[in-house]
């Protein structure tokens, strides 16, 4: 039986019809791949820019509540969220604010946390952490200004507020001294030592020496307990008595030793331990 001519195809034609594009096999063997046709992305981009993110309306409502009703109308995480609006302008900051509060327990805990720990929270980068620490520093300086050039003993609540803001959320023990003049006005506030989570080395001779250098006639000792419990230890009491005796020999008065915890403080003088 005679066979008819067999259809052949050129490089540009296929012997059958197809609706699917067929790749040029030459591109798999060293030839330059063919570039796909350029797509016009402008309409999609324009639509994306025009459509507001879902959290923008929420931001405006939160701002309005703060503007009209003040901070008492907002939860702690919402106050933090308002602040994060400016620090992280193109993200939903509500989950970040909630995560920060959950991690550190409170607003005070967030602002008292070291920058390195802040960056462990998802969404908080180094710049945001530094901004939060800057805000904390402004708050500390503001509180410190409340006790500067005033008689410290008559502004005791301000002293406690300042010490709590400065030390309550430190992760290591810190020993601080407030040096006072003969009118009990603050001369200097200095950190004398930093230690471990449960101990700070304190040298009574160095405490008294620094008081003489500043011409201080009285001091207030302050240190924190990172555990959160401000209850004084036997070592705290004994160390305080040694400093009192060393200072007394040079007519320097130790007014008190305050221990700062996360949620409160203890005065050794108030407990009649000194």
Curated annotation (Swiss-Prot):
Bias type Acidic residues, positions: 10-22
Domain MPN: 152-274
Residues spanned by motif JAMM motif: 223-236
GO biological process terms, semicolon-separated: proteolysis
Domain of life where this protein originates: Bacteria
Entry-linked CDD domains: MPN_DUF2466
Gene Ontology molecular function: any one: metallopeptidase activity
Keyword Transmembrane belongs to the record: no
Disordered: annotated span: 1-37
Keywords: Hydrolase, Metal-binding, Metalloprotease, Protease, Zinc
Short name of any one Pfam family annotated for the protein: RadC
Gene3D superfamilies in UniProt: 5' to 3' exonuclease, C-terminal subdomain (1.10.150.20), Cytidine Deaminase, domain 2 (3.40.140.10)
Residues that, per the record, bind Zn(2+): 223, 225, 236
UniProt key word Membrane: no
Name the record gives this protein: UPF0758 protein RHE_CH01848
